[in-house]
Protein backbone atom coordinates (compact mmCIF):
# COMPACT_ATOMS: atom_id res chain seq x y z
CA UNK A 1 0.00 0.00 0.00
CA UNK A 2 2.82 2.41 0.86
CA UNK A 3 4.58 1.75 -2.45
CA UNK A 4 1.38 2.48 -4.34
CA UNK A 5 0.95 5.80 -2.53
CA UNK A 6 4.57 6.75 -3.16
CA UNK A 7 4.22 5.89 -6.85
CA UNK A 8 0.96 7.82 -7.10
CA UNK A 9 2.46 10.91 -5.47
CA UNK A 10 5.62 10.68 -7.56
CA UNK A 11 3.40 10.92 -10.65
CA UNK A 12 0.89 13.46 -9.29
CA UNK A 13 3.36 16.04 -7.96
CA UNK A 14 5.10 16.73 -11.32
CA UNK A 15 1.70 16.98 -13.00
CA UNK A 16 0.62 19.57 -10.43
CA UNK A 17 3.89 21.44 -10.90
CA UNK A 18 3.32 21.57 -14.66
CA UNK A 19 -0.24 22.76 -14.12
CA UNK A 20 0.99 25.56 -11.84
CA UNK A 21 3.63 26.58 -14.41
CA UNK A 22 0.85 26.54 -17.01
CA UNK A 23 -1.27 28.75 -14.79
CA UNK A 24 1.58 31.23 -14.39
CA UNK A 25 2.11 31.41 -18.15
CA UNK A 26 -1.62 31.62 -18.87
CA UNK A 27 -1.92 34.53 -16.44
CA UNK A 28 0.43 36.48 -18.70
CA UNK A 29 -1.25 35.42 -21.95
CA UNK A 30 -4.91 35.46 -20.86
CA UNK A 31 -5.18 37.37 -17.55
CA UNK A 32 -8.97 37.03 -17.44
CA UNK A 33 -8.76 33.28 -17.89
CA UNK A 34 -11.91 33.00 -20.00
CA UNK A 35 -10.87 30.18 -22.34
CA UNK A 36 -11.45 26.53 -21.51
CA UNK A 37 -7.76 25.65 -21.01
CA UNK A 38 -7.34 28.47 -18.47
CA UNK A 39 -10.45 27.35 -16.60
CA UNK A 40 -9.29 23.72 -16.44
CA UNK A 41 -5.83 24.69 -15.20
CA UNK A 42 -7.37 27.04 -12.63
CA UNK A 43 -9.72 24.30 -11.37
CA UNK A 44 -6.81 21.87 -11.00
CA UNK A 45 -4.48 24.30 -9.22
CA UNK A 46 -6.85 26.42 -7.12
CA UNK A 47 -7.15 23.84 -4.28
CA UNK A 48 -3.39 24.20 -3.81
CA UNK A 49 -2.89 27.90 -4.56
CA UNK A 50 -6.07 29.22 -2.90
CA UNK A 51 -5.17 28.41 0.72
CA UNK A 52 -1.66 29.78 0.21
CA UNK A 53 -3.11 32.99 -1.23
CA UNK A 54 -5.25 33.39 1.90
CA UNK A 55 -2.15 33.10 4.11
CA UNK A 56 0.12 35.26 1.96
CA UNK A 57 -1.76 37.99 0.09
CA UNK A 58 -0.53 39.56 -3.14
CA UNK A 59 2.13 42.24 -2.95
CA UNK A 60 0.94 44.99 -5.25
CA UNK A 61 0.17 43.32 -8.55
CA UNK A 62 2.39 40.30 -7.81
CA UNK A 63 0.89 37.05 -6.55
CA UNK A 64 3.61 34.86 -5.08
CA UNK A 65 1.28 32.00 -4.11
CA UNK A 66 2.06 29.91 -7.23
CA UNK A 67 5.79 30.16 -6.50
CA UNK A 68 5.25 29.18 -2.88
CA UNK A 69 3.06 26.27 -4.02
CA UNK A 70 5.85 25.10 -6.34
CA UNK A 71 8.34 25.36 -3.49
CA UNK A 72 6.09 23.32 -1.16
CA UNK A 73 5.42 20.72 -3.85
CA UNK A 74 9.16 20.43 -4.40
CA UNK A 75 9.68 19.78 -0.68
CA UNK A 76 6.88 17.20 -0.72
CA UNK A 77 8.45 15.53 -3.74
CA UNK A 78 11.79 15.28 -1.95
CA UNK A 79 10.07 13.70 1.06
CA UNK A 80 8.23 11.21 -1.16
CA UNK A 81 11.40 10.31 -3.05
CA UNK A 82 13.35 9.79 0.14
CA UNK A 83 10.55 7.57 1.50
CA UNK A 84 10.61 5.43 -1.63
Predicted regions and their residues:
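Selective transmembrane helix interface/packing segments
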Residues: 1-84
Amino acid sequence: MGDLLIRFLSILIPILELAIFGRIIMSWIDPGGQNSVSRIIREITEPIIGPIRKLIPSVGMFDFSPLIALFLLNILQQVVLSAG
